[in-house]
Amino acid sequence: MSNSRQHQGHFARKRFGQNFLVDHGVIDSIVATIGPARGQRMVEIGPGLGALTGPLIERLATPESPLHAVELDRDLIGRLQQRFGALLELHAGDALAFDFRSLAAPGDKPSLRIVGNLPYNISSPLLFHLMTFADAVIDQHFMLQNEVVERMVAEPGTKAFSRLSVMLQYRYVMEKMLDVPPESFQPPPKVDSAIVRMIPYEPHELPDVDPVLLGEIVTAAFSQRRKMLRNTLGDYRETIDFDALGFDLARRAEDVSVAEYVGVAQALAALRKAG
């Protein structure tokens, strides 16, 4: 496989994190994993040169119910419009600032399916941005750096367990679906990739916790991950009775379950409300 940054006459741009999927066997496996069906509301993030876009359109799009796509590279937008016409509705702009809720069906029922080969240089901030629309989403299937996927699905007590693990596991059921080697791309990235499936918890399954407060606690806990929690959460010891919660501060951040972090955030919320 050539290391050239040019594919189909387009030069992959490093600032956009572009690596184009070219392995048709991998593409078929990804599409089968997604399982698109006619008439579904689906949005693709970063369609690139359309490697996934084409097979997705074949299976679900009609002129009345097109596939939606968010693309930042204006050179690619013109090519995609010319190739797919009315079967693809393109939204020019940065996915980090895009209002995905604007594409959801009216009402409270989740209706969106989101897919994409996400730019690896913005994957974590984009995943956090997408959390704000989780109540409108049926599922998400993303190609990501394998290391990121391993952190997303990591268990407590492992080195991969991180702030990203806690915040995403609080909101989604997640599963690593496929490994994708570098040679599946043009140009090949310097890392292995993987497909992850993310299914938001339904409202009745979600713990009653302010995600902002949860994020505050988790960020503090993982700020110095080699230190004990009695140090990283030291600022909260005068406010929260950790002993009453049964929360052992003689641990490191990666040894604490998602449910325990939620419990601390709930306690903090109650104290701030009372005070």
From Swiss-Prot:
Pfam families: RrnaAD. It is an enzyme of class 2 (transferase). It is found in: Cytoplasm. S-adenosyl-L-methionine binds at residues 19, 21, 46, 71, 94, 117. Its main location: cytoplasm. GO terms for cellular component: cytosol. InterPro entries: KsgA/Erm, rRNA_Ade_diMease-like_C, rRNA_Ade_methylase_Trfase_N, rRNA_adenine_dimethylase, SAM-dependent_MTases_sf. Keywords: Cytoplasm, Methyltransferase, RNA-binding, rRNA processing, S-adenosyl-L-methionine, Transferase. Belongs to the class I-like SAM-binding methyltransferase superfamily. rRNA adenine N(6)-methyltransferase family. RsmA subfamily. NCBIfam families: ksgA. The lineage of its organism: Bacteria, Pseudomonadati, Pseudomonadota, Betaproteobacteria, Burkholderiales. GO terms for molecular function: 16S rRNA (adenine(1518)-N(6)/adenine(1519)-N(6))-dimethyltransferase activity; RNA binding. It catalyses: adenosine(1518)/adenosine(1519) in 16S rRNA + 4 S-adenosyl-L-methionine = N(6)-dimethyladenosine(1518)/N(6)-dimethyladenosine(1519) in 16S rRNA + 4 S-adenosyl-L-homocysteine + 4 H(+). This is Ribosomal RNA small subunit methyltransferase A. Specifically dimethylates two adjacent adenosines (A1518 and A1519) in the loop of a conserved hairpin near the 3'-end of 16S rRNA in the 30S particle. May play a critical role in biogenesis of 30S subunits. Its EC number is 2.1.1.182. It comes from Burkholderia cenocepacia (strain HI2424).
